[in-house]
Amino acid sequence: TGDYAQYGQPVRDGAMLYINQLNANGGINGKQVKVLEYDDKGDGVEAVNAYNLACDNGITAVFGATMTGTTIALADATYEDNMPQVTASATATGVTVIDPADPESEIRPNVFRACFIDPYQGEKMANYAVEKLSAKTAAVFYQTGNDYSEGLMNAFVAKAAELGLEIVDTEAFAEGDKDFKAQMTNIAAADPDVVFAPIYYAEAGLAITAARAAGCDAVFMGGDGFGSVKNYASAEDLEGSVYCSGYAPGTDSVKQFEEDYKAAYNVDEIPNMFAPLAYDAAMLLCEGLKAAEEQGLTAGTDEYKQAVIDAIKNMNGTEGITGSYSFDEYNNPIKPVAIIELTGGDEVYQEMY
């Protein structure tokens, strides 16, 4: 619940769809997967409190969290216990690496993700701006003090320098800000070809609306946080904006999931990429649990937890609905991004890039 419920609810629903289907087909080695559900409200303290309560109730693995900052707080706790943890949507490098600023930093070997990471998104969108949009100049608009936003911004700027994409203006805002007129006026005056805004959907909608009012006609570009932005600005203002996603709607690999999700939750469309990513993340975690069960280990023991972790780590091309899963040395999946364009008020899949 809370400000980011449009991420959290699809994550919950996508994961539960997979687990309910798994249980309906016999579960894992004849055992049903029991889920203890907690609402962290997008807050790190709430997430850790929920984790401690869950441990008291005898959990064997953790699915979550949804937001980057919340997941890092949770990962600090699960790391101490070597508790298997899979997140569908937390993209910062600091989720699996203890200190991203230190090249020699240890990783959290127990933590995995189904989504791609912040630097990967930022680099991909810089490449896309140059290769696909023929951009020569760019402005950047990001949220200070936000791991996700700053991570994408830094990666985009570094890649832009490498590609010769000139950054003509950089603007920022703080959490809770809603009036972006001043920043968008500055960006409009800089007249960039593209504006990279690695922010979440609600703020993205406000920023794009303010930019158009200020006379800025640049193409807005975002990361996966843009998902659902169509609900937060007019179709006219959003037209031509693009973002990268971990989900390619309508493609063969996700059609059955889309049908099942719509039927299960009585909705007309998949809300955003977080539902299918959560479906895959639940699959990854359950495949790990299956490996531990097949070894006859006792749930909750150190050996059991390590077997779950090892099984996920050693996946090599395990098929999910958003792509195949193998993991690099930092427990990040190796997979392409989907490019989504805002067209006629809809978020339309363009290509894998």
Which role fits each region the language model picked out?
Residues 1-353:
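Extracytosolic ligand-binding ectodomains
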